[in-house]
Each structure stands twice: as structure tokens, then as C-alpha cells.
């Protein structure tokens, strides 16, 4: 597979700088920017994250059978109906002649190679009527060819009042699309080999009504009088990009909550106290207070000695479940997580065990993203196995305590992606507490730890 019309970043090109130079589609949300006519104190910071892989434990697989003018497909993809629509388009079959069965497989965590493997099987099956066709990608193929989650750059600008509280907040976001799932026939690798492939879809992202893609959780829930998002939808990428657990929420919350800790330090306030001082939502306050109590949070606890604690909060999409996370860790040459405390308010909890499983899974996966994961490029994708794309090991998983605030009078809220952002930011804040230095680029590698210490 050869990609055309894009300039792939090499190891000497940092993704953040590369993204800032790409063509974009501009979108603006929120209050107009008044500038700074009152000459208020100004805060600015920039954060970045590289491309990530879904890193499913098993490569993608699909099975197809074309018999008696009917196409039957078995797949572990996340959307059987969008896949059917895409197959109908590329194979020029009526949708009523296609049946797509969902079967259990390794977790997708978004849009990985499962749709592509199913499409590969379907395309071959159309040439071999009556013959079942099974396609299973190799590990290398999965890492190289599956859609990646986009690299992102997030810049935060805040104007502060005399008490050090934000009165104006701008979150500026650069990101390729998080929304190239199959549907109208686009974004299936196998379709590119057909005589009449579908046209490339126009640049788009998840609508704000559905939580946004690159802008997801880009607006603070805190009581800030004026808030806005500037979204630069990057229209070029060296690899296909699409959905991964949480979409843009993790880098947006990472940036936002690290900034909140920085503002607390500038104001001479404890991070928990500062958050509560700018938050009136009772359910948000509830999870912040609960997580702090679970961890026996001590205001003013000394840091900078290689061991630290951090806290972070978010309400996923600003309309799903609330969560706050406290993390204790140590930093030597690398970061070691010791304990995670998490409080979640998901409304009426119907299946507590299922909720806890989702919350724990989100914490572990987010920790892996923050500490280890990044797709590397060297004249193409250079991350193709577990050695070149390491993930968190079982031996590196910390002790995790979860407490559900079962607000039985409230409707149930989704929890599958609620802890990705707060976990990432809590790690970032704990590292800052342990080192006395802020690292704003993910993952938090040994090289970045050393660079931050030398800079300080």
C-alpha cells in the first residue's frame, strides 16, 4: 500500500510542529473573543499527543460467503449496519442481499481493522461463490494498516481575575478527523483495489450534538464566564485516522486539567480546593470530594522528591458520567504507578460490576497511552509489533479503588470512556508534583522526563 499526496513525518519531525503546518478547516464554538481590554493576567500553555494505535490483543478477522446472490459476513466490528452500507456501495449489491453478523472478537476500542478484514473477505468471496472465505490480518498488518487515532495539539489561553481564577478560557485544537468509519463506502482499504473505488470522503468530524471528535471535552465544565473552542480540522494525515476510545477527550482533558493545576499553583491554592472554588455543579463537586477523600488527600503535601500525587476531573462529553481520579506514583528514570482512586457518578447504576469493569479498563488503557504508546514513523509506520509499540504490562498495573456514587434519582449515564481524560491528567499532575516540572507532551517518556528536569 502506497499513500500519496501526504508528507509523512519522520523521527526528526515532531508531530505537534508537523500538524501546525497542515491545511485545516476552521471552526469556532462559544463566546466571541474580546481580547484583553482590562489587561488581566494571562496564562498560556501548549500540549500534544502523537498518533496512537488501537493495539487490540488479537489482529482483525473477517469471514464471508457469497451464495445464491446473497452475501453473508461475520465480523467483530463495532457497526454492522454501517459496514453493510459500505459493502453495498463498493460491491454494488442491494443492502437487502447482504447480512452482517456480529461475533465476539478481540476488543476494537473504536474503529480498528475489523471492518477492513471483513471487507477483504467479502471482496474475495464475491469472486469465489459458494466458498467460505476467512481473512485474518497478521500482527504487522494490523499495526501498520488499521486506522490510527489522530495526533493532536491543544493550546490553552486563560485570562485571570485578581484571585487567580479564570474569567476567559480559549481551547485551541489541531486534529485530523476522528470520524472515518465505513458507511457510504469510504475508508475501507480493500475498496481501493476495486476497478471503481468510492470517492474519498470530504473532511468532517463528529458533530457537536454527538459530543464532537477533536473538540470532545474541549470546553471546561468549570464556572468560567467566557469560554470558546477554536477547532483546526487538519485535512491531511500520513495515515488513516478514525475513532479510538474517547476520541479527542483524552488530550483535551489532559491539557485542561494540567492547566487547572498550574493555575492553582499560581494562585497559591491546593488543587482540590481550587477546583471546588470554580465549580458549582453539585455532582461534579461530589466526585472531586469523594476521590480526594478516598485517597486521604492532604492539602499542601510536599512534592518534588520523586513521588507525587495528582487529581483530575471531567464529565465525559459534558453530558455523560462524571469522574474524578487521584493517582499516586513515583518517578525515577521511568514512571511507576502505585495507586489509583476513582469516584464516578453515572446516575442510576443498573449493573455495578459492569460499570466498574468499564471504569477500570478505561483507567488502565489511558495509563498505557500516557506512559508508553505512540505510533512511530520512519518512511512509513515503524510501529509494527509489541516491541516497537509497547503497552502497559500486567505487572505495571497499579492498585485501583473505584467508588460509584449511585444517584438513584438520576438517569443512567454512559461510563465506557469516562475515565480516559481524568486518568491522563491525574498522571500528568502527579508527575509534575513529583518532579516540580511540567511535561506537556505525551507519552511521558524517559527522554521527556530528563528534558523537563534540565529545562527547570
Which residues fall in each region the model found?
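Cofactor-binding beta-sheet edge motifs in enzyme active sites
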Residues: 1-456
Amino acid at each position: 500500500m502506497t499513500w500519496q499526496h501526504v508528507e509523512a513525518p519522520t523521527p526528526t519531525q515532531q508531530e505537534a510542529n508537523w500538524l501546525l503546518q497542515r491545511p485545516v478547516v476552521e471552526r469556532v464554538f462559544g463566546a466571541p473573543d474580546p481580547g484583553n481590554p482590562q489587561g488581566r493576567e494571562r496564562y498560556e500553555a501548549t500540549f500534544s499527543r502523537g498518533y496512537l494505535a488501537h493495539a487490540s490483543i488479537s489482529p482483525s478477522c473477517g469471514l464471508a460467503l457469497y451464495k445464491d446472490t446473497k452475501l453473508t459476513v461475520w465480523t467483530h466490528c463495532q457497526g454492522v449496519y454501517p459496514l453493510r452500507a459500505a459493502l453495498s456501495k463498493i460491491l454494488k449489491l442491494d443492502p437487502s442481499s447482504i447480512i452482517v453478523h456480529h461475533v465476539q472478537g478481540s476488543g476494537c476500542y473504536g474503529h480498528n481493522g475489523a471492518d477492513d478484514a471483513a471487507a477483504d473477505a467479502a471482496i474475495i468471496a464475491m469472486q469465489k461463490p459458494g466458498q467460505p472465505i476467512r481473512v485474518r490480518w497478521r500482527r504487522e498488518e494490523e499495526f501498520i494498516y488499521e486506522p490510527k487515532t489522530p495526533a493532536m495539539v491543544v493550546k490553552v489561553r486563560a485570562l485571570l481575575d485578581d484571585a487567580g481564577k479564570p474569567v476567559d478560557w480559549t481551547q485551541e485544537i489541531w486534529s485530523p478527523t476522528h470520524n472515518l468509519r465505513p458507511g457510504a463506502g469510504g475508508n475501507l482499504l480493500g475498496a481501493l483495489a476495486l476497478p471503481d473505488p468510492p470517492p474519498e470522503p470530504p473532511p468532517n468530524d463528529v458533530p457537536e450534538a454527538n459530543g464532537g471528535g477533536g473538540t470532545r471535552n474541549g470546553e471546561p465544565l468549570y464556572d468560567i464566564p467566557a469560554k470558546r473552542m477554536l477547532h483546526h480540522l487538519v485535512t491531511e494525515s500520513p495515515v488513516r485516522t478514525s475513532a479510538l476510545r474517547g476520541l479527542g477527550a483524552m488530550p483535551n482533558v489532559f491539557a485542561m486539567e494540567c492547566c487547572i493545576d498550574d493555575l492553582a499553583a499560581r494562585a497559591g491554592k491546593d488543587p482540590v480546593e481550587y477546583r471546588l472554588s470554580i465549580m458549582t455543579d453539585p455532582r461534579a463537586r461530589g466526585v472531586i470530594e469523594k476521590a480526594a477523600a478516598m485517597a486521604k488527600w492532604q492539602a499542601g503535601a510536599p512534592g518534588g522528591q520523586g513521588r507525587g500525587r495528582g487529581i483530575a476531573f471531567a464529565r465525559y462529553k459534558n453530558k455523560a458520567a462524571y469522574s474524578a481520579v487521584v493517582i499516586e506514583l513515583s518517578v525515577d528514570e521511568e514512571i511507576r504507578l502505585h495507586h489509583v482512586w476513582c469516584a464516578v457518578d453515572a446516575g442510576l447504576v443498573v449493573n455495578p460490576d459492569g460499570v466498574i469493569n468499564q471504569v477500570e479498563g478505561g483507567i488502565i488503557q489511558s495509563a498505557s497511552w500516557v506512559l508508553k504508546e505512540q505510533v512511530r514513523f520512519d518512511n512509513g509506520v515503524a510501529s509494527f509489533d509489541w516491541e516497537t509499540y509497547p503497552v502497559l504490562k500486567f505487572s505495571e498495573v497499579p492498585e485501583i479503588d473505584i467508588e460509584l456514587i449511585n444517584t438513584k434519582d438520576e438517569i443512567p449515564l454512559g461510563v465506557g470512556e469516562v475515565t480516559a481524560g481524568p486518568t491522563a491528567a491525574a498522571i500528568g499532575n502527579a508527575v509534575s508534583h513529583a518532579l516540580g516540572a511540567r511535561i506537556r507532551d505525551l507519552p511521558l517518556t524517559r527522554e521527556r522526563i530528563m528534558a523537563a528536569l534540565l529545562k527547570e
